[in-house]
């Protein structure tokens, strides 16, 4: 985007007074909790001991009824310091949490489980669902306990005993003084073991504490607006009656007298082009020379537009700085690139916010605590997790090469589909391997006419997971590619159907070619097993073989030894490589990887990993032109694979922190457990099995033999939980003082029948069984994984002596040594503790759990884990262009940022880094990385971010309302404002006194009072989001419906699962929710197997208890009989499918008559809202049918939402607001207008309830002159939507018709280019064909180029006409003066006020001149609004007059 207009504005405005400040707030839908409760919650999250300390000291901390929040805060902080309850780092984390009000959602969530108050106190004992008892009503002689208790994840478990049958005391409180006697009573009883003591929160009854909660953790920006077309309303809009946000005045609402460069005016002044080029360098130099670099950084970047001129007249950049930057940018990070690490973890600059930083700090603190428990000092922790030995590889998991060629199977297993060296379409590709030495663009593959990159797809006809593999193989085969693809068709010996399919595939391939064979196989996999296989077979054979005799002989031939031989070779290949028919695995250059959401990245990563190895060999002459390149890659590959040892996906590996398990069961020193071998061993095996059974003893025998050969290994025996009989093995081991591997072998070689082992000490034996049960519970061994083998924390489930042998166990030990033990021994150096073998085994175990712990759960496409970490940040030097806090190297939490100071990332992160730098234990280092040459102004917006390192209070000691303030905005300049909030927030305008889309602030002088304009937004929802997939197919359950319910209503809201990543979003708010398949086809087809891919779906509860929202990863299992069915595959012409669904939708649980005409539209800014009123009037004017309007709520102003009811009532139409949060995985649009265009086209499948079959989009600035029922009834001839083609009858505009020349002319190839101002959508057809998914995929691809999709909402559907057909509406459905002749206006059914690039006429002027009825409509609407406003004034005055003094 070019900002030449900015210079024009700056030239005109040479003297400009200061503008009134603009304050921005976001209000939650729920009230603020009591501050005492917020402290309690934050302490509970920080450290449970701190929470209990707070309860014990409430009487001292709340020393008076009127203790202010500030006094309470100071008392708590000082007491925590004085009594060393929290470390300095924990105390800062607590203060940060309080400053963000991060505990408020958790406290609000209690409202979903706490019964309504029925007593006259703020703290009570909950006896049962209805009965509540105040302390004064408790009997003095014997305490009461709760009669019913249902455990809830929200509960504060103050004291929980392990004994059974102990009653519960459930105390509900606001954490004020009346909790004190309850706590003193029940805490004492709980410590005596007489009860379990649980606390729940309920807000206080005192109205003074029920204040509105204004949240933090969001950004907002005010941008200079493009003025190519003026879109400002020329009327003053009416304000709502009630509180006037313009009256908001703050103690902070004072202009600072100390500004950068000594600036005194908020004016935009010119910057010459030669100075623009070096602005980034000048900014770096100015910040570096400041005495307070962090503050200067934030002020300069956030208010850059007013500082640009002053920056440009600073002294020239020093040569020393340029030289330093040249060295940094050439060695480490290219110029202008932004990146931030926290202790080596790479942060997502866009997604990371204040709340996620708080969460990360807590995770880091937990990590430091665990390392400390392992005997490692905090100063050494970062040396381990960022050590280069770990950082360069995926420690416990790397793709091992296996011999995937089928020479061992006599070349009869693999069927090559895309055989590069023999396929004629590759004849023109270079055959010389020297081509590999030529440079190509990063990420590309050389177009070599030889087999190098190879992908082999195992296809099992009876497995649903094979269908997406086969689909991908077919797609690969349709286009030339440097990747050779093949497949192996395999089937179990007892699977007659699959065997016949594979044999038929071999036959068709031989007789009719690969294409026919693939089509046959696809149809077989895409139909159910009852399909007529031989009819499909006949369909794909040459016509000459369609006679009855040939087909009869064919059935016999398929049973012959010839095809049996091929089948056996295929199955032999699959078994040798350990391919599981249900695992959806693919072989890439010998590596066996999972076909999951990371498949593409893994595949290309393998290709790019192999290329350098081959290139070096070619350059050194180690490979000749005649050598097979794949053989070279596989020269050291293993012949066989055990998938238990080498799984195809890291996500399949489960890791356990074995030290934590031992701590939790009270056996850190091996109390009451059976340990074979030395307790001080590097290799710690745990075996969970039923030692009363032969299979458990057989695997134990293998391990005993292994231990006898390796003195550095020990073995812990754990009896499987289901059998409570003392195994004879245990009896013999318990009766002997020996616990060696030799003694174990002797026992195993002796008789182990039940009578052979006499238990001398039954109590001891029962303790062993009890301890085993506790360990099994800690390990989470349920369902399919009841037995397990662990080695230093890595867990293998579901094994036997047939699936795991001695060689496999030795390989596990070798992998453990290579990937962990050897590296940890080297890192340990002089650490005495790490020289202890047991400590190293514990540490290895813990590192594995870090490897499987995601840094964030918000995205399935980002696999960043807590370990290993990037070590490069340790190598970045410190120079003149670097800021660093004191004692950075000693900090627990080291933030290292590489930032271009004049970038949008810096506007946000300058505030965040400044705030976190105030926390104890936090170190901040910033390497400024400017672009050395700029061609345009880098920033054209003002920015603020709401964050504070601790709570802030006003002069009276009350918590100050959270807001951000723009106090440097230029007056009389057209601006536009927007909010940057995390993707889990649904934020809407609530109370605003200006047009935020077209801001023009009035100027004031310094002497004038500076009461602020205030924009109040509302946090309407916190989302539950997810990325779902089917259990075996690993593909999204597209079209599945999910419902979200609560404890009182099982169906509150619902949604559809998208094909894009299996994504879904559901609008929620803090509370306890349930997630289930929608009643109907979804519940018939699917059950939810798990909510997070690993844990079983025992409880459908979803807890929304933080501002971060909830991100799930559900796995769906198809129910029997629906394995191959398509949930969307039903006759949609009669709407049967959607008629079934709509009956269960939450939106339509009541009967209502559906409107005949459904119209949706979007508007932003008061002018377009004015147009929108008039559009609705024009629609109603030309129809007698029932009309309903659907308005996209995201962009509407509060004034519109307060006025539209009067319009709807006057003209008798219905309306409803719709919205959908832009998913964070879908590339966002930074300009608001382009975001609006995105909403017009990208979410049509999820914006509307499923009951809606058809909808018409009408631009807000359009005038309708026809009955839109005609458009609703129009046959779209199978297309999902209909658009009007662009007019070409106005000849003088021919030069502007871009679709008739260049790219579009070539692309369209005779197809029409359509305008998006009006279109009709068949929503049923749209959803059925997955049009929304296709549009979003193509958008994601094209939007990567910022110069594409100039008219997003219009270009995208036109670009996809070959996949999503457009029905061309008759030309008279849309007339636009810019493109259409004056003569055609006579028959126009709608008139669009589209822009004219020649005249750039204002919208209002054009409307009044061009549309004869527009002014009368406008006046009539104005009259309706005036009447409604007068009525509102009257009602407000009556209410005001009737109010009591207290209410006022």
Curated annotation (Swiss-Prot):
One of its GO terms (cellular component) is endoplasmic reticulum lumen. Pathway: Protein modification; protein glycosylation. Keywords: Endoplasmic reticulum, Glycoprotein, Glycosyltransferase, Signal, Transferase. It is found in: Endoplasmic reticulum lumen. One of its GO terms (biological process) is N-glycan processing. One of its GO terms (molecular function) is unfolded protein binding. Pfam families: Glyco_transf_24, Thioredoxin_12, Thioredoxin_13, Thioredoxin_14, Thioredoxin_15, UDP-g_GGTase. InterPro entries: Glyco_transf_24, Nucleotide-diphossugar_trans, UDP-g_GGtrans, UGGT_TRXL_1, UGGT_TRXL_2, UGGT_TRXL_3, UGGT_TRXL_4. Residues 1432-1441 have a biased composition (Basic and acidic residues). Glycosylated. Glycans are attached at residues 66, 749, 880, 1046, 1441. Its cofactor is Ca(2+); Mn(2+). Residues 1428-1448 are annotated as: Disordered. Residues 1149-1448 are annotated as: Glucosyltransferase. Residues 1-18 form the signal peptide. Its EC number is 2.4.1.-. Selectively reglucosylates unfolded glycoproteins, thus providing quality control for protein transport out of the ER. Unfolded, denatured glycoproteins are substantially better substrates for glucosylation by this enzyme than are the corresponding native proteins. This protein and transient glucosylation may be involved in monitoring and/or assisting the folding and assembly of newly made glycoproteins, in order to identify glycoproteins that need assistance in folding from chaperones. Belongs to the glycosyltransferase 8 family. Monomer. This is UDP-glucose:glycoprotein glucosyltransferase.
